[in-house]
């Protein structure tokens, strides 16, 4: 289908296709390909509102919920608001959801930690034994880690209850860190039949937004759960693997899905102008062949590629590019400076953002601390929320 020969409501059938997967008598799992600007969240909300209208009373009586996992608190809050905070929908970030699953199982968490700490210590001790200089920084750091992990292992007997804050830094002796919560949840889902029963009983439908960025080990666990419980459980993934931001997500998520999964596709991009969509399609042409369509009422727009040496002075280069774009587009807003500047810049990486925005001295020390690293990268570090 060409960029011109289509209607703006070409994806209208997708909502029905997704809704049909949530059949409680014959559940079906699915991966919804939804590229940039496709209206993914709108489809999610429309489908859930229709489900609520038809099955909400039944779910409330049976104390069941649909779990909707998002990547950020902002996305979670938006979906909750659009679903009118209805109790049959459990909307949370992946860390909050994982913690809800594992929190009651204190002894099982202890067993996992004992085993995991032992493996870590053995690995560190092996590396330490092969160190040529026990006084260099790497050796000193390893020695500190070995001591810390041994202390933690011994302290496990004194812990009555573990604590965890999905939006905090979790540094107390009885706390779990973000990575551990995800790994423990994945392990329990894959290996413990009781956990599998609890998940599908409470959440017979589990939907994951931005699934391409959900940690690989947890996605693999959900795949295993769906394989075992597919007669009573529907797993729905929303996403676009080309929009993957974090490297710990599952690569090529849409490849190798079971034959009995539904694979609906949203073709429209309601957000971008036509030239931009043409460029997007060209970029991904040899990757997965997915093509998006623009709205018929969108302008052509402009898409220009400037290739510069990494040795150039960035501020001068960007100023030059803005002036060039002002001439190309006949739009003076490109060339404005200071408070009148009206150009949006996409910064792809945390270190780059820190350098450009002038907070390197704040970012670097926190990034170097392993226990704070995850929080500073995903915005959950409690102290950073002050800013």
Predicted regions and their residues:
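The feature marks helicase ATPase cores and/or their adjacent C-terminal helical subdomains
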Residues: 1-387
